[in-house]
């Protein structure tokens, strides 16, 4: 008798509670919680002698900047224009000067040079010095550059060979 549209009120109530529980669970187990990293994973080189522990927020901000600004050419740590030089720790350590720390990477994002350090790449690689050419870098400040550099270093540590490893790994 109390059926509305052919559905028993008790079934409607149970369905409503189930939907609420599933929705509430999704909100609490979302992507933000999935990106929480251990402190050891967020510890990266600040310079050649010091390390720094990045906050989850710094890594998340760096990820957002990387996706919006860098991922077109550096998807999964690879380098579109030169697959032989990636954003892996091995390649960053092998650069001249080394780019395996936040401050060195920030320097590169301001004044990019070739892997051997000999050639100025300011007209070929996005940077903040030539923001007239590279509009994607125009609004990035020092903190943004540090966050995106930290994100790259964290990914290189956490993902290992999958970061910059190419199609055979990803």
From Swiss-Prot:
Coiled coil: none
Superkingdom of the source species: Bacteria
Signal peptide residue numbers: 1-34
Sorted UniProt keywords: Electron transport, Heme, Iron, Membrane, Metal-binding, Photosynthesis, Photosystem II, Signal, Thylakoid, Transport
Record's subcellular location: Cellular thylakoid membrane
GO cellular component, one term: plasma membrane-derived thylakoid membrane
Gene3D superfamilies per the UniProt record, alphabetical: Cytochrome c-like domain
One Pfam family, short name: Cytochrom_C550
InterPro entries (UniProt xref): Cyt_c-like_dom (IPR009056), Cyt_c-like_dom_sf (IPR036909), Cytochrom_C550 (IPR029490), PsbV_cyt_c550 (IPR017851), PsbV_cyt_c550-like (IPR016003)
Named cofactor requirement(s): heme c
Binding site for heme c: 70, 73-74, 125
Main location class: membrane
Record note on cofactor: Binds 1 heme c group covalently per subunit.
Topology of this chain in the membrane: Peripheral membrane protein
GO molecular function: electron transfer activity; heme binding; iron ion binding
One GO BP annotation of this record: photosynthesis, light reaction
HAMAP family from the UniProt entry: PSII_Cyt550
Function: One of the extrinsic, lumenal subunits of photosystem II (PSII). PSII is a light-driven water plastoquinone oxidoreductase, using light energy to abstract electrons from H(2)O, generating a proton gradient subsequently used for ATP formation. The extrinsic proteins stabilize the structure of photosystem II oxygen-evolving complex (OEC), the ion environment of oxygen evolution and protect the OEC against heat-induced inactivation. Low-potential cytochrome c that plays a role in the OEC of PSII.
Family per similarity comment: Belongs to the cytochrome c family. PsbV subfamily.
Quaternary structure, from the entry: PSII is composed of 1 copy each of membrane proteins PsbA, PsbB, PsbC, PsbD, PsbE, PsbF, PsbH, PsbI, PsbJ, PsbK, PsbL, PsbM, PsbT, PsbX, PsbY, PsbZ, Psb30/Ycf12, peripheral proteins PsbO, CyanoQ (PsbQ), PsbU, PsbV and a large number of cofactors. It forms dimeric complexes.
Protein name: Photosystem II extrinsic protein V
The species this protein was found in: Picosynechococcus sp. (strain ATCC 27264 / PCC 7002 / PR-6)
């Amino acid at each position: 008798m109390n059926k509305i549209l052919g559905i028993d009120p008790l079934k409607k109530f149970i369905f409503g509670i189930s939907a609420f529980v599933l929705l509430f669970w999704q909100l609490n187990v979302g992507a933000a919680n999935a990106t929480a990293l251990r402190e050891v994973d967020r510890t990266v080189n600040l310079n050649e002698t010091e390390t720094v522990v990045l906050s989850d927020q710094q890594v998340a901000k760096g990820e957002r900047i990387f996706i919006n600004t860098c991922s077109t050419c550096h998807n999964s740590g690879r380098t579109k224009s030169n697959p032989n030089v990636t954003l892996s720790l091995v390649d960053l350590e092998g650069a001249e000067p080394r780019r395996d720390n936040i401050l060195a990477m920030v320097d590169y994002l301001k004044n990019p040079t070739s892997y051997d350090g000999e050639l100025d790449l300011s007209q070929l690689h996005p940077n903040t010095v030539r923001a007239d050419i590279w509009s994607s870098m125009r609004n990035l400040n020092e903190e943004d550059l540090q966050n995106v550099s930290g994100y790259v270093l964290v990914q290189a540590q956490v993902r290992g060979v999958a970061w910059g490893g190419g199609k055979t790994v990803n």
